[in-house]
Regions:
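Short, solvent-exposed loop/beta-turn-alpha elements that line the ligand-binding surface or hinge
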Residues: 94-111, 170, 174, 191-214, ...
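Extracytoplasmic/periplasmic substrate-binding proteins
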Residues: 26, 217-291
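Mature extracytoplasmic/periplasmic domains
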Residues: 92, 257, 281-355
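Glycine-centered hinge/linker elements that transmit conformational signals in sensory
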Residues: 157-158, 201-231
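Conserved C-terminal helix/tail region of periplasmic/extracytoplasmic solute-binding proteins
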Residues: 44, 49, 140, 224, ...
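Extracytoplasmic/periplasmic solute-binding protein
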Residues: 120-124, 130, 154-202
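Conserved N-terminal structural module of periplasmic/extracytoplasmic solute-binding proteins
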Residues: 18-85, 101, 146, 253, ...
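Hinge/lid segment of periplasmic solute-binding proteins
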Residues: 81-130, 267, 333
Length: 387
């Protein structure tokens, strides 16, 4: 009788939430394939069906304002830039009392929180820029270990530099000036704290301040001593690093899908760093959603431990709420451990954007080959900051 009663209650619960929720997200191909299991699990738990379509954020930025003006929405749950969410709160459902905001890691919801503290979006999973990657086999072959202090880091670079066949200790990937920018941000966060990165983004700290010069000065110290290679196209030098021409390579989490054997990968952050750049996927529920009740159930699921556990188990994602480390594939477990106790920080040049971003990239390319020009570089960056 009890089993029958439980079964009936489950059926009633499913019936209460019967319906369909439409979702717009940025993922296609294999990335979409990794997201669908999350939606399937949501469907199995709630009885709510779903539809999913891929839409670029750049295109949504043109479509959504007109839709909202007509009190319409192309979907019930939409993944979109955080800046769009906070700029359109009149057309977006407040989620402060819908999701468990306390479950998030520090800083994860900052970008979708209004000045009055109201939360208008969820922080789904993220990709992070954790630090310096190395091949376990390379470290084992040469008796190397990850550092736990700045002095140990410098000593490690010296050992790698002295290894036969090594060109430089650290491979300097480059394109338009990225990923040199990611390396620089890592030093700003490690030696100036997450607060320095946030203050620079908000324009509350000068690029010529002691805090900035001290942090980037640490980077310049390493460049001057030849530990970093000359900037080289980032996928080309990635292959060279993998083949043993360099010992370390700073890159985001997506590197795990770009090498032949991700099980041979390991990573460490600069010792003592209290923050890490997270590239978080944000989502919101429009006020004009056709299936608002179902949409709110989905965002609760996506912002919870169960939904995010399923996503991270697919690989290439880090949860923004606490999940068991056992849910991660092997290489992502190491990244997840590095994120414990650290604060999420926005990408610096992406946040400031505009002409300043290209100036930042250009100045870093200069800094890598002319490190003695540090003061000129910082002055130029300060002068070009948007007002």
């Amino acid at each position: 009788m009890k089993k029958l009663l439980v079964a009936v209650l489950i059926l009633i619960s499913a019936a209460l939430f019967a319906g369909t929720v439409s979702v717009i997200g940025p993922w296609s191909g294999v990335e979409m394939d990794a997201f669908i299991p999350v939606l399937e699990a949501f469907k199995a738990e709630t009885g709510i069906d779903y539809t999913y379509q891929t839409y670029r954020a750049e295109d949504l930025a043109n479509v959504l304002p007109a839709q909202f003006s007509a009190k319409k929405s192309p979907a019930d749950v939409i993944f979109m830039w955080s800046s769009f969410i906070t700029s359109n709160t009149k057309s977006i459902v407040e989620l402060t009392e819908v999701i468990d905001t306390d479950a998030y890691i520090p800083g994860a919801l900052d970008n979708v929180t209004a000045a009055d503290g109201a939360v208008y979006g969820i922080a789904y999973t993220a990709k992070v820029k954790p630090g310096f990657w190395y091949r376990k086999s390379f470290f084992e072959a040469h008796g190397l270990t990850a550092p736990s202090s700045w002095d140990e880091f410098v000593a490690l670079l010296e050992k790698i530099k002295a290894t036969p066949g090594i060109k430089n200790a650290i491979a300097s990937g480059n394109g338009v000036g990225w990923p040199l920018s990611d390396v620089t941000e890592h030093f700003l966060i490690a030696f100036g704290g997450p607060e320095l990165q946030k203050d620079l983004i908000e324009g509350n700290t000068s690029w010529t301040s002691y805090a900035v010069r001290n942090a980037i000065g640490k980077l310049v110290y390493l460049i001057e001593r030849g530990y970093f290679s000359e900037p080289t196209e980032w996928t080309t030098i990635l292959e060279q690093w993998w083949n043993g021409e360099y010992g370390l390579y700073f890159m985001g989490q997506w590197i795990t899908g770009m090498v032949d054997d991700s099980d041979d990968l390991a990573v460490f952050s600069l010792p003592g760093s209290r923050g890490m750049v997270f590239s978080i996927d944000y989502a919101f529920v429009p006020e004009f959603a056709a299936n608002k009740t179902e949409a709110l159930e989905l965002v609760k699921f996506l912002s919870g431990e169960k939904g995010q556990s399923i996503q991270v188990s697919q690989g290439g994602h880090i949860a923004t709420v606490e999940v068991y480390v056992s849910n991660y594939p092997p290489v992502d477990k190491e990244i997840a451990k590095l994120t414990e106790g650290v604060e999420t920080v926005n990408d610096l040049d992406d946040s400031i954007g505009g002409l300043w971003q290209t100036a930042f990239w250009d100045q870093l390319k200069l800094l890598w080959v002319r490190p003695e020009r540090l003061d000129d570089v910082l002055m130029d960056l300060e002068q070009k900051m948007p007002e």
